[in-house]
Amino acid sequence: MIRFSPWSFAALVIGAALTHAALATGDPNAGKIKFATCTGCHAIPGYTNAYPTYHVPRLGGQHPDYVAAALKDYQAGGRQHPTMHANAFPLGEQDIQDIAAYVASFKPAASPQPIRGDAAAGKIKSATCVACHGSDGKSQIPIYPRLAGQYEDYLRKALTDYQSGARQNPIMKSLTAPLSTQDIADLSAWFASQPGGLVTVQPD
């Protein structure tokens, strides 16, 4: 199992705090209007990507800093997804912060979903994940995503992409490198099965 030293984690947490302090303030009311383009995928419960087939991620209750960073990654091409790149590309800094503030304004409350992997095994295997993502997937560090209640197949896709390098992140690349297909399934099941997690954004 790969582990980081306490100093490594301290550096990550300090970096997260500095990043958080540097971000502009988002307006959730403005973000609600700007999110309109996103509703066709992210506001439909159970909606799936065309190919490969996996659920479009739940965003309600996610950390705004993480959402903003993800949108910037799509803008720059660091995360490869043609539709997301096209939608994120024209956004300005304030647009990104407003959208992030809007999705973060939803209270995490999702019920556990039916799962395919072994959640009990995933809990044991998640020991390396907890420093950033929390023991139950409810990360308290703004730049690291909450995972509780996220779609299981989306989590499997994300971990597989980190492992293959299709999704770029040096830390996640190193942590996923030794994982088997079963490990990925079990970890995904554990985080997806946690109550009080992410929800589908539902504009009123």
Where are these regions (language model features)?
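Interaction-mediating elements
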Residues: 68, 73, 81, 98-101, ...
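Sequence/structural segment immediately N-terminal to covalent heme-attachment motifs in c-type
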Residues: 25-48, 114-138, 150-151, 204
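C-terminal capping alpha-helices of c-type cytochrome domains
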Residues: 89-111, 162, 177-204
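Inter-heme linker and motif-flanking segments adjacent to c-type heme-binding CXXCH motifs
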Residues: 45-51, 77-82, 105-117, 135-145, ...
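N-terminal signal peptide c-region/cleavage motif recognized by signal peptidases
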Residues: 19-21
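Bacterial N-terminal signal peptides that target proteins for export
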Residues: 1-11
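Gly/Gly-Pro-rich "capping" loops immediately C-terminal to redox-active cysteine motifs
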Residues: 28, 32, 45-75, 85-90, ...
